[in-house]
Design a protein with these regions (language model features):
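Alpha-helical linker/edge segments of TPR/alpha-solenoid repeat scaffolds
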Residues: 48-54, 231-240
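Alpha-helical repeat scaffolds
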Residues: 204-205, 237-250
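Short inter-helical turns and helix N-cap capping residues of alpha-solenoid HEAT/ARM repeat scaffolds
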Residues: 214-215
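Conserved small/polar residues in nucleotide/adenosyl-binding loops
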Residues: 253-254
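Extended, helix-rich scaffolding/adaptor regions
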Residues: 1-129, 142-143
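Alpha-helical solenoid scaffolds in large eukaryotic transport, assembly, and signaling factors
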Residues: 116-183, 187-208, 234-235
Length: 254
C-alpha cells in the first residue's frame, strides 16, 4: 500500500494518495497520524472547492506543493510507524517500550550528559579510597552509557522531530559540557533515522552541526550524515528548496 501511495504522489494524484494513506494509518493504529491525515484531506478539499468556484488565489500553486510535501512526510511516517508496530526485533521492542514508559526528554538527557564530566571529576578528587573510587567511577560510566544509549534509541526510532525536539537536540549540540563523543553518537542516530524516514528538522540539525561545532569528530560525522542523506533521500530533498539552498551553502565551505 505504501508503494502505491508514493506512486500516486509521484504522479501528482493527491486525492487517490490520501485515500490510501487513510487506510495505511488505520493499519498503523496511530490516532495522531490519522488526525493529521484528516486535516490534510480537509485542507485539500477546501482548495478544490475554491478552485471549482473560480476563485483566484495566487498562492494556490504554493499551497498545493506544501500539501504534496506534507503527504509524502505523512506517508513515510505512517509506514515507519506501521513497521515498528507490527514488526519484530530491536526497534519493534524499543517502540513498544517507549509507548509503555516514555523516555527522558532531550533537555533531561542534556542535563545528565553535562553532569557526567563534573561528577567524574568530583569522584576522582573527593573519594580517597581507591576501591570505592573505582566503584563510584564505574557506576558513573554505566549511568552515562545508559543515557547515551537512550538518546540514540529515541532518535533512531523517531519518525519526525517537533520544533520542541529540535530545540532540545540543539541544546545538546550547543552545550560546552556534553562530551564530543556523545554528540557524535547522537549524529549517527540522526543519520540512521534520516536514511529510514526523511525529516527536514533532522537534516537542518546535521547542517547546523557541520557548520557550527568546534570538534572535528562531530563535524566529520555530520558531513557523513549529510552525504548519506543526500544520496538516499535525494527525491525527498528536492521537495525542500530551502534545505537544498542550505546544503549548497554548506558544500561551498567544504
Amino acid at each position: 500500500m505504501y508503494n502505491d501511495i508514493i506512486e500516486f504522489l509521484d504522479n501528482k494524484r493527491l486525492k487517490e494518495a490520501l485515500v490510501q494513506l487513510t487506510a495505511l494509518a488505520h493499519e498503523a493504529d496511530n490516532w495522531q497520524l490519522s488526525s493529521e491525515i484528516e486535516s490534510l484531506q480537509t485542507t485539500y478539499s477546501y482548495m478544490l472547492q475554491y478552485a471549482a468556484q473560480g476563485m483566484e488565489d495566487p498562492e494556490r500553486n504554493k499551497l498545493y506543493h506544501q500539501l504534496l510535501r506534507t503527504a509524502y512526510e505523512l506517508a513515510d511516517r505512517t509506514e515507519a510507524t506501521r513497521k515498528y508496530r507490527t514488526g519484530t526485533g530491536y526497534m519493534h521492542g524499543k517502540y513498544y517500550s517507549f509507548q509503555q514508559i516514555p523516555p527522558h526528554s532531550y533537555q533531561e538527557i542534556c542535563l545528565s550528559l553535562e553532569a557526567f564530566s563534573e561528577n567524574l571529576g568530583m569522584a576522582q578528587i573527593t573519594v580517597m579510597d581507591e576501591e570505592r573510587r573505582s566503584e563510584t567511577v564505574n557506576k558513573l560510566y554505566i549511568e552515562h552509557e545508559k543515557y547515551v544509549t537512550e538518546l540514540f534509541d529515541i532518535i533512531w526510532i523517531s519518525t519526525h522531530w517537533t520544533d520542541e525536539d529540535l530545540s532540545g537536540a540543539n541544546s545538546i549540540l550547543e552545550s560546552l559540557l556534553v562530551p564530543a563523543n556523545d554528540v557524535a553518537v547522537m549524529i549517527s542516530a540522526v543519520t540512521l533515522s534520516l536514511i529510514q524516514v526523511f525529516d527536514s528538522r533532522k537534516f537542518q540539525f546535521l547542517i547546523k552541526a557541520y557548520q557550527t561545532h568546534s570538534e572535528t569528530i562531530v563535524v566529520q560525522r555530520a558531513l557523513i550524515g549529510i552525504a548519506l542523506t543526500a544520496y538516499y533521500q535525494e527525491k525527498r530533498l528536492k521537495l525542500y528548496p530551502d534545505l537544498q539552498a542550505a546544503l549548497s551553502l554548506s558544500l561551498i565551505h567544504i
